[in-house]
Amino acid sequence: MGTILDKIVEQKKKEVAELYEIYTPVKTKRKTQSLVEALQQFTVIAEVKRASPSKGDINLHVDVRKQVGTYEKCGAGAVSVLTDGQFFKGSFHDLQTAREESNIPLLCKDFIIDKIQIDRAYEAGADIILLIVAALTKEKLKELYSYVLEKGLEAIVEVHDEQELETAIVLNPHVIGINNRNLKTFEVDLSQTEKLGKRLNEEKLLWISESGIHSKEDIIRVKRAGAKGVLVGEALMTSSSISSFFEDCKVNI
């Protein structure tokens, strides 16, 4: 059967093959925005997330332009956009729309397995690329991280457990993302932030917490663990008061 992650990666291989047939990267350079700079103070990376494998449809018909505008007005330090179509109902068009609306750092959230996806994300306006350790071999991770640097972009290298963390640390990446969600089962455990955060604090690396963050209590918990930011999707996409969530994020510990 394979895990959910296995199925997603298989789909990505098909999409990459199609991209090579229909898409030619444009050789242009543009100015990019820095997530590292934004993370000098506690930052919310606010996500545009229409759907997910675990929750189904979340906010399928969201007005991306309006949502991103609200995020920026409420104080988001960066915006994340799901570009996976099959499992998350996102698109590169959503990413491009977000770029047109906002000048803050923009993350392409996808399952990146090939350089051509990075080219496509760059052209759509991304400043940051998500690289998921669980989806890549060590060699491929290193190759893609080098390519991100070559393009003048930043990377969030995402980990879920100790083994993946050690793989990520070797790269000395811009930012490490601790995903509280196990991508093999899609179960969420916020204690992963506390466990892995200790090691990252020792290494003095910049890191954020991803997934399962819904409340003021969750924000306090990840701040205490040492996170410099949070990536929040579902809670914001279903919120009746986005501004209240951002106010909760300002809590002092």
UniProtKB/Swiss-Prot annotation:
It comes from the Bacteria. It catalyses: 1-(2-carboxyphenylamino)-1-deoxy-D-ribulose 5-phosphate + H(+) = (1S,2R)-1-C-(indol-3-yl)glycerol 3-phosphate + CO2 + H2O. It is an enzyme of class 4 (lyase). GO terms for biological process: L-tryptophan biosynthetic process. Keywords: Amino-acid biosynthesis, Aromatic amino acid biosynthesis, Decarboxylase, Lyase, Tryptophan biosynthesis. Coiled coil: none annotated. GO terms for molecular function: indole-3-glycerol-phosphate synthase activity; phosphoribosylanthranilate isomerase activity. Pathway: Amino-acid biosynthesis; L-tryptophan biosynthesis; L-tryptophan from chorismate: step 4/5. Its EC number is 4.1.1.48. Pfam families: IGPS. Belongs to the TrpC family. PANTHER family: INDOLE-3-GLYCEROL-PHOSPHATE SYNTHASE, TRYPTOPHAN BIOSYNTHESIS PROTEIN. This is Indole-3-glycerol phosphate synthase. It comes from Bacillus cereus (strain ATCC 14579 / DSM 31 / CCUG 7414 / JCM 2152 / NBRC 15305 / NCIMB 9373 / NCTC 2599 / NRRL B-3711). The gene is trpC.
